Design a protein with these regions (language model features):
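Start-of-helix register in tetratricopeptide repeats
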Residues: 35, 69, 101-104
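Terminal, low-structured helical/coil segments at or just beyond the last alpha-helical repeat
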Residues: 86-116
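Structural marker of alpha-solenoid helical repeat scaffolds
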Residues: 29, 63, 94-97
Length: 116
């Protein structure tokens, strides 16, 4: 995220692609780990691969429907792809948690874009 803020998008993308390789290996070893699926979704989203990102998030939600990170990041993906109603569905899941993920997704919905 810091590289992106400094305008070093190419360098950030290189790190995300490298992370994907390690995450895919971890996912192969333990495909039922929602945290790994969340990170795979995040890294794919960051390089602009929204289709694969959404797949990883949705598989993660099948395993852990209330996973805070997945619900937040999938909601942000929906905001970034103009599916606000779907983003609000993810926000509803986070509603009772009184957590940072709820606040960040709510801000993304209100602003119409994600800071990530």
């Amino acid at each position: 995220k810091k590289l992106e803020k400094k305008g070093k998008i190419d360098k950030a993308e290189k790190y995300y692609k490298k992370a994907i390789k390690y995450l895919l290996k971890a996912n192969a070893e333990n495909p039922a780990d929602p945290d790994t699926l969340n990170y795979l979704g995040f890294t794919h989203r960051k390089i602009g691969n929204f289709k694969d990102a959404e797949i990883y998030y949705l598989v993660g939600l099948e395993i852990a429907p209330t996973h805070k990170g997945i619900n937040e990041y999938l909601g942000e993906l929906y905001v970034n792809t103009n599916r606000i109603e779907k983003a609000k569905e993810r926000l509803k899941v986070l509603e009772g948690c009184k957590c940072e993920e709820f606040e960040e997704l709510q801000a993304a919905i209100n602003q119409g874009s994600s800071k990530y």
